[in-house]
């Protein structure tokens, strides 16, 4: 079954930073990149091919962001795994729920920590969890 790993968290909690770590980890395993879109603030959208499987990654998860159009793009490109950011409630969560039941949704939470060193450690730990879940899903 197709799967979405959705990282939810409040605004400015580090979701983009965490998913950029995930992106870097998965990029090292990618056979090719089908779609790449970066913007100056660090957000990225990619479709990677890993072990013959299309994987969509969207780091923008704020309301009124490109999340909806990215998920449509990922679905059109038959991505079997989608990794994205959302807020904890509201429109971004609904956008992800709209892809069920075609996609199983695996929710992961982003902690909000004020101390930079703890935040970096937490982001890395959450990224590792998501990377390992993706590897398991992709059989790599």
Q: Where do the language-model regions lie?
A:
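Conserved nucleotide-sensing/catalytic segment adjacent to the nucleotide-binding pocket
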Residues: 31-87, 93
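Active-site catalytic pocket residues across diverse enzymes, especially alpha/beta-hydrolases
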Residues: 26, 30, 100
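Short, glycine/charged-enriched secondary-structure capping and boundary segments
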Residues: 21-22, 71-72, 96-99
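Glycine-rich phosphate-binding P-loop
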Residues: 3-26
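Phosphate/oxyanion-binding active-site loops and adjacent basic polyanion-contact surfaces
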Residues: 15, 59-63, 67, 119-127
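Short, Lys/Arg-enriched charge-dense amphipathic segments
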Residues: 5, 28, 55-65, 105-114, ...
């Amino acid at each position: 079954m197709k799967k979405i790993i959705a990282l939810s968290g409040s605004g400015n909690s580090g979701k983009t930073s965490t998913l950029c770590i995930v992106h870097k980890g998965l990029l090292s395993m990618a056979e090719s990149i089908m779609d790449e879109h970066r913007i100056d603030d660090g957000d990225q959208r990619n479709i990677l091919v890993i072990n013959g499987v299309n994987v969509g990654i969207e780091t923008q998860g704020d309301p009124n962001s490109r999340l909806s159009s990215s998920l449509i793009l990922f679905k059109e490109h038959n991505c079997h795994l989608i990794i994205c950011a959302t807020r904890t409630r509201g429109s971004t969560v609904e956008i992800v729920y709209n892809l069920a039941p075609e996609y199983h949704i695996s929710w992961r939470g982003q902690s909000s920590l004020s101390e930079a060193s703890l935040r970096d450690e937490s982001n890395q730990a959450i990224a590792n969890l998501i990377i390992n879940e993706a590897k398991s899903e992709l059989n790599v």
